[in-house]
Amino acid sequence: MDRLRVGLLLLFLCPFLVVAKEVKLASPNKVLHAEVSIDEHVSIRVLQNKDVLFAVRNIYLNTDQGYIPEKSSKVRSVKTKAVDRMVVPEIKEKRSVIAERYNELSFLFADKTKLEIRLYDEGMAYRMLTNRKGELTIFDEAADFVFAPSSTVFFQQDSNMNSDYEAPYVEQKIQDIKQGVTGNYPALVKIPSGTNILLLESDLQDYPCLWLEKGSQNLNAHFWNYPKTYNVNGNSKNRRQIVACEDYIAKTSGKRTFPWRVFAVAQEDKDLMDNQLVYLLAPECQIEDPSWIKPGWVTFDWWARRGLYNVDFKAGINTATAKYMIDFAADFGIRYFLFDDGWTYKEDLTKTIAGLDMKEVVDYATSKGVDVMLWVTYDLFDNQMDAALAQFSEWGIKGLKIDFINRSDQEASNFYWKAAKKAAEYKMVLDFHGAYRPDGLRRAYPNVLTREALVEFEQNGGTYKDNPDNRLMLPFIRNVAGPMDYIPGTMNNATKGSFRFNHDTPMGQGTRAHFMAMAVIAESPMQMLPDPQSDYYREAECTKFLVDIPVEWDDLVTLDSKIGDYVAMARRNGNSWYVAAVTDWTSREMKLELSFLPKGKKYKMEVFRDGINADIRAIDYKHEFIEVEGGEILNVSLAPGGGWVAKISTL
């Protein structure tokens, strides 16, 4: 559980106001300000000092019991609260201790609805709390997000209720987006002044995900309705796709809290990467003793079984191949081996295909200090959850990759919580694929180590989507919501001109040093290795450094970075710092200041950087050891699609 240090708590009551005029709230550092007005509906305006950043207008629920809060609702009371505490996360995604400081306004309306608004130094969040008897049918949740029309939006535009959430980011001015265009969260808005506002949500339970829809002028809240009928004729990968919907978005308890609507604010691009509002606004850990949860690296067989060489067995989904991959994991200290798609007998998760003895494989892995994970589909796993988990536990399975959820309605969001809770009962970790973005579930159930919801490395098998331009948006947008399963570290590297599609052995668009650096930049307590194990044996020098990069961190320092162009950061694990920088297809000279180290103190630095010919052959790299001093400024040269990564240790 989080260990808290709770600071000042202030309360005041304003009894039975007929109409609440504008109420103001300031962030702890008094830079951000919120002005709340209640007329026909609630509106919130957010300012940075005296400059308006954005507004949220017409906040209400449309339900079978009318509007909540009621139109022109009377306010019974207003309370304020100030919190200053330190939160210790179960899994150290960014740092070992998180500072949480906010000021809160809480409105109680005559219909017993509450509206809570929090201002952090890093942004604003609001949510509703209802107090109704019985069940509540919600037809829609309204909110108009008002930004300057010339503001630029970065988000995944999508019109599919069965979305896989793997679209590249589209960069477009609000005024140029056509009315009716929809897209999913997180969405980044850069207003004309250059300030960034990242739209997120947290504590999503028993409710659909929030999307965006372009209205006549503004961005509006959009939700997918509850499913009525499904595709019943497909396979287990698409059988739960929605064909028709009900006329409501949710049926839920009338007495509940609703998800937090989150707006992260950052003056500089680099500050987005350090924002943790989604985590802080999520429910606290629900697992009594989470000490069994083990983050780590994963090697898996999806591409690898089609790319092995220098072996004396027929590669495939079989016991011999699995043991070879487990030996590789043991040789390099990798925690997990994952069986991906293909290991099950037909559509029965309790049985394996011929030639694969799961119990023998797991026992062998255990003897080598390696844990085994299994890939499953949403449809099969949801139907067989109890029987499957019992069988997996008997085999000794330690984790699951759950794929092809491809939905964000209320029923689907409930599945995430159900799967996390049931997996925790069997002490199994989870990785969601075909999944919507993180929403705080990982704080309540830290066995949810990572998830997809991005254009990740596998897209290189048949598209150009995972290019450095899109990839360098991820740390500022997708990764702010929570861990992302990008799958870094390919040894099959290509320049922009040499890149080709190859589904069985995909190439990565960028240099060797770029993809090694992505293991520091792409934040995830579970990192996957994409390539065949044979390739990693061949490139042992790179492999050893790569898989020694931690997946948990004690501290983060963001360095000079620009959305979509270049990223630089330093992360600390124990006494070691890892520093990484990557660029888009533009070659770049960067200066990295070691200001996070004590000035003048000497350190040893191990570096992997772009080789002199990396612009021609992306596999070209230079490995060297250098002595550096705290406060020193390093000159770093990056090839097109290039990278630089270093480990800094005490002498």
Residue ranges, per PLM feature:
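Aromatic- and carboxylate-enriched substrate-binding clefts and catalytic-loop regions
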Residues: F339-T511
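C-terminal beta-strand-rich structural cap/linker in extracellular carbohydrate-active enzymes
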Residues: F625-L651
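Glycan-recognition and catalytic regions of carbohydrate-active enzymes
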Residues: D531-Y578, V582, D615-I619
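N-terminal accessory beta-strand-rich subdomains and adjacent acidic, glycine-rich linkers
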Residues: E22-Y279
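Carbohydrate-binding surface patches
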Residues: I563-K601, W644-V645
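An acidic-aromatic substrate-binding cleft motif
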Residues: I249-F328, F332
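Conserved, mostly hydrophobic/aromatic
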Residues: A329, D403, L430, I521, ...
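Bacterial Sec-dependent N-terminal signal peptides
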Residues: M1-E22
